[in-house]
Amino acid sequence: MNLVDLWLTRSLSMCLLLQSFVLMILCFHSASMCPKGCLCSSSGGLNVTCSNANLKEIPRDLPPETVLLYLDSNQITSIPNEIFKDLHQLRVLNLSKNGIEFIDEHAFKGVAETLQTLDLSDNRIQSVHKNAFNNLKARARIANNPWHCDCTLQQVLRSMASNHETAHNVICKTSVLDEHAGRPFLNAANDADLCNLPKKTTDYAMLVTMFGWFTMVISYVVYYVRQNQEDARRHLEYLKSLPSRQKKADEPDDISTVV
């Protein structure tokens, strides 16, 4: 083996060794950045799995290169504003089977346009801000939540109109119209425009106000009549108590008779 071949062999060995060393550092770095209670792997991009980890909130130390994030089957109750804003490569987000009740207006800021799958099924979501899902391109799963069907939900689902599955699986737990409770949202929306309903609340308030005024007027009239009757009775008793001015039989007439 000549010197050139020996040099090439040693150079190749050094390159392979350096490459292995760099890969080890990267793997160690990724592992060290993995949130507590989660498992991280690099299969098809960084996969962060935090399922069944007894998490009460979304970790704030998620690696920025996360592509798939599984936070299902925990005890998370809310999704704060901009919690995912640094995860620009995020494609899949699973938050199913938690106790989520609140989703802030800008919860998905930074990932709304890159997400491909969003799973919020099997939570406790009753309503969300009308802008919570703005620009969301993901296929969203929001079934098995106690949704309150009203104008806001109608606006939210209309903003996600490209995803028919999203609205199709929404069942109204409660509704501004009692007859829609327990029915699929699409059926309720076909029956009535939830953003253009008669203002029954105003009518009820007006009726209550009118009834209150009517009651006050009747009460005043009854009081006034009774008070007048009492005053009349007292006046009559007073008159009866005065001495009688009857003429005595032996008193001469005041008028003299002219003979």
Swiss-Prot record:
Residue stretches making up the LRRNT domain: 34-64
Keyword annotations from UniProtKB, A to Z: Glycoprotein, Leucine-rich repeat, Membrane, Repeat, Signal, Transmembrane, Transmembrane helix
Compartments it resides in: Membrane
Position of the signal peptide: 1-33
Topology within the bilayer: Single-pass membrane protein
Residues of this chain annotated as glycosylated in UniProt: 47, 94
Keyword presence, RNA-binding: no
The LRR repeat ranges on this chain: 65-86, 89-110, 114-135
Domain LRRCT per the UniProt entry, residue ranges: 145-197
GO cellular component, one term: membrane
PROSITE patterns (alphabetical): LRR (PS51450)
Membrane found in the keyword field: yes
Membrane-spanning segments: 205-225
S-S bonds: none
InterPro entries: Leu-rich_rpt, Leu-rich_rpt_typical-subtyp, LRR_dom_sf, LRRNT
Protein family per UniProt: Belongs to the LRRC3 family.
Protein's name in the database: Leucine-rich repeat-containing protein 3B
Species per Swiss-Prot/TrEMBL record: Homo sapiens (Human)
Recorded name of the encoding gene: LRRC3B
